Amino acid sequence: MFGCLVAGRLVQAAPQQVAEDKFVFDLPDYENINHVVVFMLGTVPFPEGMGGSVYFCYPDQSGMAVWQLLGFVTNEKPSAIFKISGLKSGKGSQHPFGAMNLPQTPTVAQIGISVELLENLVQQTPVANAAVSSVDSFTEFTQKMLDNFYNFASSFAVTQAQMTPNPSEAFIPANVVLKWYENFQRRLTQNPLFWKT
């Protein structure tokens, strides 16, 4: 039903089932892992109205399990990338794995998936900094930056009659800035990563 992927390692497609609705993947040598991908294999969908909350578990200094909510996967969102590199020293959160006696090894962390009602999933708050930036947030930032630049540059616009001659200053016509702004917006809409080419 689930898979787990860490860059440079083989895909894990057979989690340990620790309860009817709970699954765990071991992450050996977790200190050297920055991101983890959790995904549905596409063979068995979630039952109607269900999804899977995804947790990261690592042993603290005393060897006790610290669980942190990363996010969730659903039939509509069957995969997610999580950044775990900054979470290895944070506080734990409420989790459904509490009563289970899962073995803890100092160098092995775990990814836990708990099958739950969708209405419960959307009410949970993942630990900060677990989500990887998406194209949507980048696109939103770029759009706000464009708007801010255009508004700033436009606030200095003057008519030719209002210009004071100054041979040491260059002037850019406002229609050139507007043309650039519209062109950049169009390209961003077509391909948010166009600037990489």
Curated annotation (Swiss-Prot):
MF term (GO), any: Hsp70 protein binding
Transmembrane segments: none
GO biological process: cellular response to heat; protein import into nucleus; protein transport
Pfam families tied to this protein: Hikeshi-like_C, Hikeshi-like_N
Keyword terms of this UniProt record: Cytoplasm, Nucleus, Protein transport, Transport
Highest taxon of source: Eukaryota
PANTHER family given in the database record: HIKESHI FAMILY MEMBER, PROTEIN HIKESHI
Annotated function: Acts as a specific nuclear import carrier for HSP70 proteins following heat-shock stress: acts by mediating the nucleoporin-dependent translocation of ATP-bound HSP70 proteins into the nucleus. HSP70 proteins import is required to protect cells from heat shock damages.
Protein name per its UniProtKB record: Protein Hikeshi
Organism (species): Gallus gallus
